[in-house]
UniProtKB/Swiss-Prot annotation:
A lyase-type mechanism (elimination/hydration) is suggested for the cleavage of the lactyl ether bond of MurNAc 6-phosphate, with the formation of an alpha,beta-unsaturated aldehyde intermediate with (E)-stereochemistry, followed by the syn addition of water to give product. The active site is at E81, E112. GO terms for molecular function: carbohydrate derivative binding; carbon-oxygen lyase activity; ether hydrolase activity. Homodimer. It is an enzyme of class 4 (lyase). The gene is murQ. Pathway: Amino-sugar metabolism; N-acetylmuramate degradation. This is N-acetylmuramic acid 6-phosphate etherase. The lineage of its organism: Bacteria, Bacillati, Bacillota, Bacilli, Bacillales. NCBIfam families: N-acetylmuramic acid 6-phosphate etherase (TIGR00274), PRK05441.1 (NF003915), PRK12570.1 (NF009222). Belongs to the GCKR-like family. MurNAc-6-P etherase subfamily. Specifically catalyzes the cleavage of the D-lactyl ether substituent of MurNAc 6-phosphate, producing GlcNAc 6-phosphate and D-lactate. PROSITE patterns: GCKR, SIS.
Length: 295
């Protein structure tokens, strides 16, 4: 463990406990600013991962995050957000954490060290060769994640290792390695800090770009969001208003006519067509609004 960057002591915070609160905050903030830059070198690899994820997603595959502790929680968080943001089915983007749901709020002793459980959890969701499995581990050596990636390889799923150390163990068992070297943590070994931030940013990129690739975004607007509350319903109407150049009242009326489906509403308006025709256009164009409009 001592050779891992994530376990090393940060020379900028050797006397962290002696700093004033403001001095410590400035130091933490300065370290946090290194995170986005640390992601830049892996963008070409990330591009390849996302291209393949889009292809598999279109073919009925799923995006599956798996990790332990903070890493697992971040995967569960990103997966959960895809449902309201992009109207995905809960089974399309899945977050798995060592120790199960209970591990979201408390530490489960020994869970991350269980190699076989990583395999078992993937078997439980009936992993198949169309799926993409992203193993998340700041240290890059978590047995639970390594077991999951090993099993995923056996059934020909696409495997990706996301870690915050170079030449990590999990990188050796994945088709693609995403290694974000953020340097030693402000608090030695506390990977919920810079490492967690880096993982969150990378997962955001993967899910966002995948959803753009399968047609869930128009320009920079979420045209496939699921309006599960009043705020999101209002946002849906405003999106129609913005794209179609309508008043709020007109957009609201159109939204209702389209059975609360933003995409159908947009195609109906911009193509001056019926709901049925708008649906057909979308089906024939992989659910991509701009292509449906041009068809």
């Amino acid at each position: 463990m001592e050779h891992l960057t994530t376990e090393s002591r940060n020379t900028q915070t050797m006397h962290l406990d002696e700093m004033s609160i403001l001095e410590a905050l400035k130091t933490i903030n300065k370290e946090d600013q290194l995170v986005a830059k640390a992601i830049e070198p892996i963008l070409p690899q990330l591009n390849r991962v996302i291209e393949q994820t889009i292809t598999r997603f279109r073919d009925g595959g799923r995006l599956i995050y798996i990790g332990a502790g903070t890493s697992g929680r971040l995967g569960v968080l990103d997966a959960a957000e895809c449902v309201p943001t992009f109207n995905t089915h809960p089974n399309e983007v899945i977050g798995l954490i060592a120790g199960g749901q209970q591990a979201m709020t408390e530490a489960i002793e020994g869970a991350e060290d269980n190699y076989e459980m990583g395999m078992t959890d993937l078997k439980a969701i009936h992993l198949n060769e169309k799926d993409v499995v992203i193993g998340i581990s700041a240290s890059g050596r978590t047995p639970y994640v390594k077991g999951a990636l090993t099993y995923a390889n056996e059934i020909s799923a696409l495997t990706v290792a996301l870690s915050c150390n170079t030449n990590s163990d999990i990188s050796t068992v994945a088709s693609h390695a995403l290694e974000v070297n953020v340097g030693p943590e402000v608090l030695a070994g506390s990977t919920r800090l810079k490492s967690g931030t880096a993982q969150k940013l990378v997962l955001n990129m993967i899910s966002t770009m995948t959803m753009i690739g399968v047609g869930k975004v128009y320009d920079n607007l979420m045209v496939d969001l699921k309006a599960t509350n009043h705020k999101l319903e209002q946002r849906s109407i405003h999106i129609i208003e913005e794209i179609c150049g309508l008043t709020f009242e007109e957009a609201q009326e159109l939204y209702i006519k389209a059975d609360n489906d933003i995409k159908i509403a947009i195609v109906m308006n911009l193509c001056n067509t019926t709901k049925s025709d708008a649906q057909s256009r979308l089906i024939n164009n992989n659910d991509i609004v701009k292509k449906a409009i041009q068809s």
